[in-house]
Amino acid sequence: MKIRWKLLLALLLVSGAGVLAADVEIIAHRGASYDAPENTLESVRLGWEQKADAVEVDVFLSKDGEVVLHHDATTKKIAGVDRKVADQTYAELRQLDVGAWKGSKWKGVRIPKLDAVLTTIPDGKRMFIEVKCGPEIIPALGRSFRKSGKSPDQLVVISFNYEVVKQAKAKFPRIKCFYLSSFKMDKESGEQIPSVEELIAKAKAAQLDGLNVSYKGLQSEAFFKKVKSAGMGLFTWTVNSSDVARRLAKRGIDGITTDRPAWLRERLASADSE
């Protein structure tokens, strides 16, 4: 009898962990950026190969109006050229090597257009597009979305720039839009800022679909409850710890952005703690 109970308990533990993995959307941060150069076709495709539910990419508007993948405002860190993305044409950006820094096997990898990246989205999966510039990119985003032929439920717009997500939601009402936020502590009050109430109010004012915040600000269950009570989605970034991911999953996070999608999914599906 004791053996049967032990077997039943083991099955429940495994089943419960599996539910965590199934309930949480695993989002590949800049593609599978732990293994491949970030924000490239190579990292995006690898993200899909690693069974990510979604892939997140960063975009800027080039000098000639193309929506291109890149994280920083300049190309210095990745390509060694200290020029703003916005001051370079796509032809100039395509001359840059954005793979060699990751290793010799990636030498020659180039900056892609969003158009090319959107074509990779498999059926039933979606792409989170983080806008790193201002709302001037929105008309070009619309052209890319229409050209892709992807359904609105396969596209998500996110940004730290409130005006961007506000205008994006007004322009693309059928596309999910989430407000990105990090946090800091107020030295005088000791309170976390911005507060969850402030974030919810801003999201509601722009009719956004929810929040996408740093996991470091998700220390209390109250944060989760308030966002859920407001009827909003709650996503987080950038989690490469299995312990943190499990804690957030148990509290009801909707999605986790990670550099290691396959690895994190395996950890969430496992009952073994590390």
Which role fits each region the language model picked out?
Residues 1-9:
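Bacterial N-terminal signal peptides that target proteins for export
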Residues 8-16:
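Bacterial N-terminal signal peptides
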Residues 18-274:
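Phosphate-group recognition and catalysis centered on beta-loop-alpha active-site segments
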